[in-house]
Design a protein with these regions (language model features):
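...with weaker cross-activation on analogous glycine-rich loops/strands in unrelated enzymes
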Residues: 1-35
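Aromatic- and glycine-rich peptidoglycan recognition patches
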Residues: 24-60
Length: 60
């Protein structure tokens, strides 16, 4: 993925959750998101992670 891409999660527990990719380091990313694990404000709640079960949207 690239910085600025919209990450879309799919699967039984995260279907449709979206986040914006803020950093990329090899196969790991960081994202900014809201409504993750009860957090209402936009922020980076996961740190570096290797995504699974996601696709990306690239805005023009």
């Amino acid at each position: 993925p690239q910085v600025g891409a919209i990450m879309v999660e799919y699967g039984p527990t995260a279907y449709g959750h979206v986040a914006v990719v803020s950093m990329v380091n090899g196969s790991q990313i960081q994202v900014r998101e809201a409504n993750y694990n009860g957090n209402q404000a936009i922020g980076n709640y996961r740190g570096w992670f290797t995504p699974g079960g996601v696709t990306y949207i690239y805005p023009n």
